[in-house]
From Swiss-Prot:
GO terms for molecular function: GTP binding; magnesium ion binding; uracil phosphoribosyltransferase activity. Gene3D superfamilies: 3.40.50.2020. Keywords: Allosteric enzyme, Glycosyltransferase, GTP-binding, Magnesium, Nucleotide-binding, Transferase. Binds 1 Mg(2+) ion per subunit. The magnesium is bound as Mg-PRPP. Pfam families: UPRTase. Signal peptide: none annotated. One of its GO terms (biological process) is uracil salvage. It comes from the Bacteria. This is Uracil phosphoribosyltransferase. SUPFAM superfamilies: PRTase-like (SSF53271). Belongs to the UPRTase family.
Length: 209
């Protein structure tokens, strides 16, 4: 399943992020706010379990609590920019990290770090990365988690293009993809157009090449 959000709050915040005049701080703030809005919908099919509690009025109440582990896995480094927004909404979630970068000469994905919590294989895994461009980083991350036996993986990105969507859905048809926007295309350097620019540079205030 591919879900592209249509929500006025997300659209307005995303427009702010797209502007080259937006400061690093405002870029980060809007990214976290959009991530919070997106994870709300991403967790819609999460299965809870029934529990019994007593209210301050000494009344028994049959309610719900989270049943399975939720693990947020940002793809470094840009995925870190979405983490706080999600953790504000799901503070009990655990966090893993996958470090990848793209070799600018070969466009190949290079992994340099991988660490995730020891959790059951039916845990709810949410991979986050602002950009879904060629889909190579996402597929490499999903493949590694799939090989470890995780069977409930979702991919949450701000913007993506058809090329990346097709690559992920072809290799991993059971992985749901959530996007704030589907953009037009990639340029000759595999950057998304109209896009956001280099999300990592804009999050962390590093020099934009």
């Amino acid at each position: 399943m591919v879900k592209i959000f249509q929500h006025p709050l997300i659209n307005a915040k995303l427009t702010t992020m797209r502007s080259k005049e937006t400061s690093y701080k405002d870029f980060r703030d809007n990214l976290n706010e959009i991530a919070s809005l997106m994870v709300y919908e991403t967790l819609r099919d999460y299965q809870t379990k029934k529990i019994s509690i007593t209210t301050p009025m000494n009344v028994k109440y049959e309610g719900e609590t989270l049943d399975r582990e939720i693990v947020i896995i940002p793809i470094l480094r840009a995925g870190l920019g979405m983490l706080n927004g999600i953790m504000n909404l799901v503070p009990q979630a655990r966090v893993g990290h996958i470090g990848m970068y793209r070799n600018e000469e070969t466009n190949e994905v290079v992994e340099y770090f991988f660490k995730i919590p020891e959790v059951p294989h039916d845990s709810y895994i949410i991979i986050v990365d602002p950009m879904l461009a060629t889909g190579s980083s996402a597929c490499d991350a999903i493949a590694k988690l799939d090989k470890l036996g995780f069977n409930n993986i979702k991919l949450v990105c701000l913007v993506g293009v058809q090329q990346g969507i097709d690559k992920v859905t072809k290799q991993f048809p059971n992985v749901d993809i959530y996007l704030a926007s589907k953009d037009e295309k990639l340029n000759e350097h595999n950057y998304i157009l109209p896009g956001l620019g280099d999300a990592g540079d804009r999050i962390f205030g590093t020099k934009i090449k």
